């Protein structure tokens, strides 16, 4: 049998056979790599050897960064080598900072975006897209008709003072009366919203459509006996462009666990 002295022991046994203190860390640079060897105790209170290999690379940094790297260390880290010490320094992930600009620059950016929006304009609904991409190209509203007003007879100075004139035929400072305005009402900017919840209220409808632009009239259909919503409503916008935007956004939009169906309101047959 070979003698016990001839058996080679491992490096861990050799380290444990020492006085009990950890050997100092060593650092070797060769072939463009830095090899750092350290000794420490693990969870089981055993000495372990940790070898770290770093690749050396040269980068160009700003002068302020180079000046910070040349600052002398102090305190408990006065004797540390250049670079972070893993026992006292934890390298975390990079945090990117976002600088907030002043309001004038933000306003300039918004004005630039608004000018870009006016480059493309649909001839059908005046939306911000090409005419052949318009979703309402083949609908009944692809060519909106101008509201026709009934001709108002001219009043002369020779008319009799006691003659009766219907209200809708009267003129006030060159403007048609109330009756003529109602007969010439433009419904081309009205939309119909379907598949609404029974709990829908006028306040909810106002909150739903007010972000698309000003409107002149809203009608929420309700049941006469129960007072609940019948499931549809009409909204008249001042601008047909705002109405087209509302249709594009709300059609297929999920609201109150239901999918809304929004379309152009069909014009009523003249009576």
UniProtKB/Swiss-Prot annotation:
Entry superkingdom: Eukaryota
Cellular component aspect of the GO annotation: eukaryotic 43S preinitiation complex; eukaryotic 48S preinitiation complex; eukaryotic translation initiation factor 3 complex
GO molecular function list: RNA binding; translation initiation factor activity
SMART domains: RRM
Location of the RRM domain: 189-267
Pfam families: eIF3g, RRM_1
Gene3D superfamilies from the UniProt entry: 3.30.70.330
GO BP: formation of cytoplasmic translation initiation complex
UniProt xrefs under InterPro entries: eIF3_g (IPR017334), eIF3g_N (IPR024675), eIF3G_RRM (IPR034240), Nucleotide-bd_a/b_plait_sf (IPR012677), RBD_domain_sf (IPR035979), RRM_dom (IPR000504)
Subunit structure: Component of the eukaryotic translation initiation factor 3 (eIF-3) complex.
Family: Belongs to the eIF-3 subunit G family.
The protein's name: Eukaryotic translation initiation factor 3 subunit G
Naturally occurring in which organism (per UniProt): Anopheles gambiae (African malaria mosquito)
Lineage of producing organism: Eukaryota, Metazoa, Ecdysozoa, Arthropoda, Hexapoda
């Amino acid at each position: 049998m070979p003698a016990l002295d001839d058996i080679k022991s491992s490096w861990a046994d050799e380290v444990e056979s020492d006085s009990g203190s950890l050997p100092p860390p060593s650092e070797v640079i060769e072939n463009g790599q830095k090899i750092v060897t350290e000794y420490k105790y693990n969870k089981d209170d055993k000495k372990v050897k940790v070898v770290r290999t770093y690749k050396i690379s040269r980068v160009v940094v700003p002068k302020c960064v180079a000046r910070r790297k040349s600052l002398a260390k102090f305190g408990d880290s006065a004797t540390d080598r250049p670079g972070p010490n893993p026992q006292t320094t934890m390298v975390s992930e990079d945090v990117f900072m976002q600088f907030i600009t002043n309001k004038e620059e933000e306003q300039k950016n918004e004005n630039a975006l608004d000018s870009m929006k006016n480059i493309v304009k649909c001839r059908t609904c005046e939306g911000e897209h090409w005419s052949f991409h318009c979703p309402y190209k083949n609908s009944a509203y692809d060519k909106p008709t101008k509201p026709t007003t009934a001709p108002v007879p001219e009043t002369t100075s020779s008319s009799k003072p006691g003659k009766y004139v219907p209200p809708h035929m009267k003129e006030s400072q060159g403007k048609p009366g109330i009756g003529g305005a109602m007969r010439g009402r433009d419904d081309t900017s009205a939309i119909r919203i379907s598949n609404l919840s029974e709990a829908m209220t006028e306040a909810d409808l106002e909150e739903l459509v007010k972000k698309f632009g000003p409107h002149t009239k809203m009608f929420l259909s309700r049941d006469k006996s129960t007072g609940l919503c019948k499931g549809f409503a009409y909204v008249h916008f001042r601008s047909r462009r705002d109405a087209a935007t509302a249709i594009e956004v709300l059609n297929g939009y999920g609201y109150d666990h239901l999918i809304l169906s929004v379309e152009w309101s069909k014009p009523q047959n003249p009576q």
